[in-house]
A protein has these predicted regions:
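Beta/coil-rich, acidic/histidine-enriched accessory regions frequently appended to metallopeptidases
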Residues: 208-247
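Generic structural signal for hydrophobic core residues of well-folded globular domains
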Residues: 119, 145, 149, 188-192, ...
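Post-HExxH zinc-binding segment in Zn-dependent metallohydrolases
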Residues: 131-175, 182, 187
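Contiguous mid-protein beta-loop-alpha structural module that forms a pocket-lining wall or clamp
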Residues: 177-178, 182-210, 224, 230
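N-terminal low-structure segments adjacent to metalloprotease catalytic domains
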Residues: 1-10
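An acidic- and aromatic-residue-enriched active-site/binding cleft used to recognize and process polar
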Residues: 79, 123-125, 147, 163-166, ...
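Juxtacatalytic substrate-recognition/specificity segment
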Residues: 11-134, 138-142, 152-155
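Residue-level recognition of short, structured coil/turn motifs
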Residues: 59, 124, 150-154, 193, ...
Length: 247
C-alpha cells in the first residue's frame, strides 16, 4: 500500500502516497473520472512551515520528544472519500492521513488542522498529558493552531464565523461550536503567551475537563474564571485581539 519508493521528505516530515497514484503525484491516473493530482512541492513547503511554527513558536512538543528522533508522517490516500484526520503511529510519532480533494487549496487549511492533531497526540506519545475533556478541546485547539499559521482563516472559512454568530449563547466547548470558536484560546494565548495552549494540553489530568485544568493552572476560583470569560467575550464583540488587528 505504501512504499519508500513513493515517499518524499522534508527535514521533519515524511510524505507517503498509496500505490494507486503511481510514482508521480503530479500526474496520477484519474479515479472514477476525478483528477487525483497533488502539488507535492507546495505540500512539502507548507507542512514544514506549519511544523516549525507548532514546534518552535507554539512549543507543542518539548525537548526530548520522539519527534526529534523520527519524522512525522503524512499519508496520502488514493480515494475520493474526502477524509482527513490526524493522530499518531503506534503512540510513537505524529501522523495524519488525507485524500487529494483535501489538498487542493494553496494554503492547505485542512493540513494545518490535521497536523495540529498530530502535535496534540505527539505530546501524549511523549508521556505528557492525557486525552482529556472529550474531542472538543482537540478540535478547537487544532482550529486555533490553523488560525496561527493562516491569519486569513476566518475569510477562507467564513461559514464557521457565520454559524458561530448564531450560536454564541452556547457554552464554551459545546460540541456544535468546537470547529467555529477558537477565540477563547486566542484570548488565553494573548494573556499568557503562545506556548500556553500547548502547556494546557500537557497539564491535562484524568478526571478534569479543560476548564478545570485551566483554573488549576491559573489558580482561579469559579467566580474569577467567570469574570475572565466575560472579559474574553467583551473582546470578541469588536474582535479586539492584538494579533487580529495586526493582520
Amino acid at each position: 500500500r505504501y512504499s519508500s519508493r513513493r515517499m518524499s521528505c522534508t527535514d521533519n516530515l515524511a510524505i507517503f502516497w498509496e500505490k494507486g497514484f503511481g510514482n508521480d503525484l503530479a500526474a496520477p491516473p484519474d479515479l472514477e473520472g476525478h483528477p487525483m493530482a497533488v502539488d507535492l512541492e507546495n505540500l512539502k513547503y507548507q507542512l514544514e512551515r506549519f511544523y516549525l511554527f507548532y514546534r518552535d513558536s507554539l512549543k507543542f512538543v518539548k525537548p526530548g520528544s520522539q519527534s526529534e528522533k523520527y519524522r512525522m508522517m503524512s499519508m496520502i490516500q488514493y480515494s475520493l472519500e474526502g477524509t482527513a484526520y490526524g493522530g499518531d503511529y503506534d503512540q510513537v510519532i505524529g501522523a495524519f492521513w488525507a485524500t487529494p480533494n483535501r489538498l487542493q487549496d494553496k494554503r492547505l487549511n485542512a493540513v494545518a488542522h490535521e497536523l495540529g492533531h498530530s502535535f496534540q497526540l505527539q505530546s501524549i506519545a511523549d508521556g505528557e498529558g492525557v486525552a482529556w475533556g472529550g474531542n472538543g478541546i482537540f478540535e478547537m485547539g487544532a482550529q486555533w493552531m490553523l488560525w496561527q499559521v493562516n491569519p486569513h482563516w476566518i475569510d477562507d472559512e467564513t461559514y464557521h464565523w457565520d454559524a458561530f454568530k448564531k450560536n454564541t449563547h452556547k457554552a464554551f466547548l459545546h460540541t456544535e461550536n468546537i470547529y467555529r470558536s477558537p477565540y477563547i484560546l486566542e484570548y488565553w494565548s494573548e494573556r499568557q503567551g503562545l506556548p500556553f495552549i500547548g502547556e494546557l494540553f500537557r497539564q491535562g489530568k484524568k478526571g478534569e475537563d479543560p476548564v478545570m485544568t485551566y483554573k488549576r493552572m491559573q489558580n482561579l476560583s469559579q467566580e474569577q474564571f467567570n469574570d475572565e470569560m466575560f472579559d474574553a467575550y467583551q473582546h470578541l464583540i469588536n474582535f479586539d485581539y492584538k494579533r487580529v488587528f495586526s493582520i
